[in-house]
Amino acid sequence: LTYFLRGEAQIGPKVRLWFVVSVILHSLYLVLLGVHLDHLPVGNLFQVLTSFAWLLVVVYLYLELRLKEMTMGVFLLPIVLLFHIVSTLLLNLDQPLATVLSDMLFEVHVAFIISAYAAFTISFITSTMYLLLSHEMHSKELGIFFQRLPSLEFFESISNQSINIGFVLIAIGFILGLEMGLELWEGQWYTEPKLLSVIAALVIYLIHIVTRRSMGWRGKRAAIISIIGFTWLFTSMTIVNLFFTRFHKFQ
């Protein structure tokens, strides 16, 4: 935040160093958590949250180093911090693991899904930054977003690429999960809220890809669809995980 507000180049290396250290510490935390649990930390919602937060910062660190652009961090890191805090406060280390969750196929399924969510989160953040910058550029007064942020094309490119990658990942994760779920649900897949939520997300992001490529929907319209897709994913998955899901809890 200090780097974003002040724009002082000399702060950049220090900020990146602390960020790298935090990623290393988070990695060690996940390793120790996995050793304690005797499985990948994806067995319940709060394990997934901290794994997702880690994956998100790793992807962001890669983008930051590759693109040499640090401004996205001020929008992304609060999300990461929120997920990790919630996970740390509510994680139950003594909760038994359902038998089906120990299947390697399940872990691969979750890995694809949270990787897709990470891609969609990056798209959401860059789309939001695109709209903020676009709004400021069309206003009479140019402020901090115009001064600190790179071009609109920069954010549009990252957002579109993230959705392309995320769509493939979530489709693969969906197929793997469906293969497992059909055996558990005994043909009643249409009663599983989380599955229906993912199908709706697939439709939203498919609309983004199709309209962008065949109808030329770029810029603001593409950014808005990206934000709608992420908002749907975040709200629906939060509600479903906390209140409605039965089969994904395997109770």
Q: Where in the sequence are the language-model features?
A:
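Juxtamembrane inter-helical linkers in multi-pass membrane proteins
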Residues: 137-153
